[in-house]
Amino acid sequence: MATSHKSENSLLFEWLSEYWHNLLFQLDDELAINTFESRMAKDVTIKINHDHVPRQVYFEYITGTRAAHDLTLISQKQLKVWEAPGGGGSIAYEGELMYNDKKTGEKQTGSVVMIADIRKGDDGNFTIVQSTEIATR
C-alpha cells in the first residue's frame, strides 16, 4: 500500500532537494542543464501562479535567473508526500531562497510552494511529470 508522510523527510523530498540544489544553488551551469534535461519530463505540465508554462520557457527562466543572480537556499521543507507503491509519487514542498543580483548586488528573498508529481521510469530514474508552483519574490 502507498504511504503518506507528514513530518519525516521522504526519498522524494531528498530527490527534489537534490534537484533544486543542482538546478539553482550550485555554480556549474552544465550540471544545472543536465539536471533539468534528465529530471524534467519532455511532456511535463508546468503551472506557475496560475499560468501554464511550456517546458522550454521554464528552462529559459531557470537559465536566465542563474545568469542574473547568485542564489542561496535559506530553508526548505516537505509539507506532505504520497509515495506510489512502485516508486515516485507526489510531494508538496516549500522553499525560501535569496536572490543576489550579480550586477547591482541587490538582494531579494523569494519563496515557493510546489506540488510535484514524480514518476519512476522503467530505467529506475525519477522525473517530474507535473509541477504547480506558487512563487513570490
Positions of predicted regions on the chain:
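Generic alpha-helical structural signal
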Residues: 17-18, 59, 94, 113
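A short linear-motif detector with a strong N-terminal bias
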Residues: 17, 24-26, 38, 52-54, ...
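A beta-strand edge to alpha-helix "cap/lid" segment located at domain peripheries
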Residues: 67-137
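A solvent-exposed, acidic/Ser-Thr-rich amphipathic alpha-helical stretch
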Residues: 33-38, 42-85, 89
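Short, low-complexity N-terminal intrinsically disordered segments enriched in polar/charged residues
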Residues: 1-38, 42
